[in-house]
A protein has these predicted regions:
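Glycine-rich phosphate/pyrophosphate-binding loop and the adjoining helix
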Residues: 68, 77-109
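Glycine-rich phosphate/nucleotide-binding loop
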Residues: 1-86
Length: 109
């Protein structure tokens, strides 16, 4: 697991950072979907976390549960918000808060 964690973190850096990368741990009897970045307690409550990884983890969960249409809609909304470049969090070069980014994604849905 150590090497998998290292490789996944390196790959996250290639796509823009840990704030963008969702994860899925799928086993025989269950599945867990979560951002790969962890809890980031040092910036908790500051409203500057990028929620993309969390939102996309939910999309992965919906796809796993057979809700492909809902999963695709969420992924498209996230992609559209990022592509527009108007409502980006600090880690993506913007000034939007966590809530502002999430609200922009919701508006796209």
């Amino acid at each position: 697991n150590l090497y998998g964690d290292i490789v996944s973190d390196l790959c996250a850096g290639l796509v823009g950072g840990l704030g963008l990368t969702p994860s899925a741990n799928i086993g025989k009897d269950g599945a867990i979907f979560e951002p790969i970045h962890g809890s980031a307690p040092d910036i908790a409550g500051q409203h500057k976390i990028n929620p993309t990884a969390c939102i996309l983890s939910a999309s992965l969960m919906l796809a796993h549960l057979g809700e492909a249409k809902a999963a695709a809609a969420i992924e498209k909304a996230v992609t559209d918000v990022i592509s527009e470049g108007k409502t980006l969090t600090q880690d993506m070069g913007g000034t939007a808060s966590t809530e502002e980014f999430a609200d922009a994604v919701i508006a796209k849905l």
